[in-house]
Curated annotation (Swiss-Prot):
This is Small ribosomal subunit protein uS4. Keywords: Ribonucleoprotein, Ribosomal protein, RNA-binding, rRNA-binding. One of the primary rRNA binding proteins, it binds directly to 16S rRNA where it nucleates assembly of the body of the 30S subunit. With S5 and S12 plays an important role in translational accuracy. GO terms for biological process: ribosomal small subunit biogenesis; translation.
Length: 206
C-alpha cells in the first residue's frame, strides 16, 4: 500500500466515514477509528467536537489540506460577498486538483495533486503544476497528450462509484474538461454530509 493510499484510508478511519465513497474503504468493514483505542464505544460529541470534526472532514476530503492552507481559503471565503459556507465550498472546488478529480481524470484527490505536481495538466493550453491553482469559469483543463495513456487515467474514467458533476463538462476521449461554473454545496457530489456551517462556527470561536 502506498503512503498516499495509507493516508487516505487513515482519514476514513479517523472520521469513521467513507468520505470518498470508495468500495475498498476500511470503514466498509468496521465502524471504529484507527489505532489500538479505536474500538472503544463512541461518546456523544460536544459542540466543539462536532465543529472540529466538520473542519477535519472537509480538510481531509480535499487531500488532507494543512491547517494553514485551509485557514487561508476560509479567510478568503469570509472576505468575499455572499454566504461564507457556500463561498468556502466554491473556492475548494475551484482548486485545480479538485477539478482534475471531478473530471474523473484520476481515481483519487491525492492522485490529482500528484498528477498536477508532475506537470501532466494544461489549463487553457498552458502547463500548470500547482494543485491549488484557482480555476475560473470557462477554463479548459486537459491532460497533456503524452500522459493520456497512463493506466491510472484509464482506470479512473471507468470508476462506477462517482459521476462527473454538471459544473464540469468532461470529454474522456480527448481527456479535456471545461469548468462550467462555480458550484454551491448542494451541487457537489459528496458521498457524505459536509457541514460548512459548523466550520464557520469553529473559526468564529478559535
Amino acid at each position: 500500500m502506498t503512503k498516499r493510499t495509507s493516508a487516505k484510508y487513515k482519514i476514513d478511519r479517523r472520521m469513521g466515514e467513507n468520505i470518498w465513497g470508495r468500495p475498498k474503504s476500511p470503514v466498509n468493514r468496521r465502524e471504529y477509528g484507527p489505532g489500538q483505542h479505536g474500538q472503544r464505544r463512541k461518546q456523544k460529541m460536544s459542540d466543539f467536537g462536532l465543529q472540529l470534526r466538520a473542519k477535519q472532514k472537509l480538510k481531509g476530503y480535499y487531500g488532507d489540506l494543512t491547517e494553514k492552507q485551509f485557514r487561508r481559503i476560509y479567510a478568503e471565503a469570509e472576505r468575499v460577498k455572499g454566504d461564507t459556507g457556500e463561498n468556502l465550498i466554491g473556492l475548494l472546488e475551484r482548486r485545480l486538483d479538485a477539478v482534475v478529480y471531478r473530471a474523473k481524470f484520476v481515481p483519487t484527490v491525492f492522485a490529482a495533486r500528484q498528477f498536477v505536481n508532475h506537470g501532466h495538466v494544461l489549463v487553457n493550453g498552458e502547463r500548470v503544476n500547482i494543485p491549488s491553482y484557482r480555476v475560473k469559469e470557462g477554463d479548459v483543463i486537459e491532460v497533456r497528450e503524452k500522459s493520456r495513456q497512463m493506466a491510472a487515467l484509464l482506470e479512473a474514467t471507468q470508476l462506477p462509484e462517482r459521476d462527473v458533476p454538471d459544473y464540469v463538462d468532461a470529454d474522456h476521449n480527448k481527456m479535456k474538461a471545461t469548468f462550467v461554473r462555480t458550484p454551491g454545496l448542494a451541487d457537489v457530489p459528496y458521498p457524505v454530509m459536509m457541514e460548512p456551517n459548523l466550520v464557520i462556527e469553529y473559526y468564529a470561536q478559535n
